[in-house]
Design a protein with these regions (language model features):
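A mobile, often basic/glycine-rich helix-loop segment
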Residues: 202-221
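Short, structured coil/loop segments at alpha-helix boundaries
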Residues: 8-15, 37-40, 58, 143-144, ...
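Non-catalytic, mostly N-terminal accessory regions of nucleic-acid modification and defense proteins
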Residues: 1-105
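Hydrophobic alpha-helical scaffolding
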Residues: 33, 58, 139-143, 189, ...
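Conserved Class I SAM-dependent methyltransferase catalytic core
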Residues: 220-235
C-alpha cells in the first residue's frame, strides 16, 4: 500500500508530502501481525462498499468526492472534541465569512486571497468558490499533518493550485515579499478562523513590522490581537 501511494505522489507534485506521510505498516498505530492485517482488511473493505460508488449518481456540477472528504473531516472534528475541531470551520460559517469579504464582487483576475490559519482549508476553499473566476489562494497552517489535510482538501475540490504551507504564522511566516524576505506579502483578501485565546503565542516571534504603529505588543497570554495585527499587515 505504501509503495502504491508513493507512486501516486511521485507523479503528482501537489500530493507530495501529503498522501505519502501516512504509513500503512506503522505498528505503533495499527498494531502488529494479525492485528495489522485485520485492521487494514476492514479499512479497504469500507471503500469497496457499493454505496460508496458515486459514478452513476454524479450530477453535473456536483463535487461529491470533495463533499465526502469534508463530511469525514467534519465528523472527525465533532467526534474528537473541541481541541481537535479547531482545524475545521463549519460550512455554514465558511459561507458567511466568504460573503462578508465580498470576493464574489472581485473583478481583478490577478487578485489574491490568504488564510494565515487555514486548518484543513475548508474556509479558504469556500471563499475561492465564491469568486466568479479562478484567483490565487494561499494558506498557512501550524500543524504539518493538518496542512496535509488542507492540500488534499484542495485537490479534491479542484483547487490544486492553492499554495498551502506549514509553519507558525508568528514565528515562521511563509509568505513574504520576493524582493524583501523581511516584509510580509500583501493580499487582496484575508479570511481566517484562527484559534482564539492562544497562550504563549509570542514564543519565537519574529516581528516583520507587524506591530509597529499600534502601540505595545499584545499580551503574551492572549494572542487574539496578535492575529488581528498580523491580518492587517498582510492586507
Amino acid at each position: 500500500m505504501d509503495k502504491i501511494i508513493a507512486r501516486l505522489a511521485e507523479v503528482n507534485d501537489s500530493l507530495k508530502g501529503v498522501i505519502d506521510i501516512a504509513h500503512f505498516n506503522d505498528e505503533a498505530k495499527i498494531g502488529k501481525g494479525q492485528e495489522m492485517v485485520d485492521k487494514l482488511t476492514k479499512l479497504i473493505a469500507i471503500f469497496q462498499r457499493p454505496e460508496l460508488n458515486f459514478s452513476k449518481n454524479k450530477a453535473e456540477g456536483d463535487d461529491i468526492i470533495g463533499d465526502a472528504y469534508e463530511y469525514l473531516m467534519r465528523n472527525f472534528a465533532t467526534e474528537s472534541g473541541k481541541s481537535k475541531g479547531q482545524f475545521y470551520t463549519p460550512a455554514e460559517v465558511s459561507r458567511i465569512l466568504a460573503k462578508i469579504i465580498g470576493i464574489d464582487k472581485c473583478t481583478d483576475h490577478d487578485a489574491t486571497i490568504c488564510d494565515p490559519a487555514c486548518g484543513s482549508g475548508s474556509l479558504l476553499i469556500r471563499a475561492l468558490s465564491e469568486a466568479s473566476f479562478e484567483i490565487s489562494g494561499y494558506g498557512q497552517e501550524k500543524e504539518v499533518s493538518t496542512a496535509g489535510l488542507a492540500k488534499m482538501n484542495a485537490v479534491l475540490h479542484n483547487k490544486a493550485t492553492i499554495k498551502i504551507m506549514a509553519g507558525n504564522t508568528f514565528s515562521d511566516p511563509q509568505f513574504t515579499k520576493e524582493n524583501d524576505s523581511s516584509e510580509l506579502e500583501r493580499f487582496d483578501y484575508i479570511v481566517a478562523n484562527p484559534p482564539f485565546s492562544l497562550k504563549n503565542w509570542s514564543d519565537g516571534l519574529k516581528e516583520f513590522g507587524r506591530f509597529s504603529g499600534y502601540g505595545d505588543r499584545p499580551p503574551e497570554k492572549n494572542g487574539d490581537y496578535g492575529k488581528y495585527y498580523y491580518t492587517v499587515r498582510h492586507a
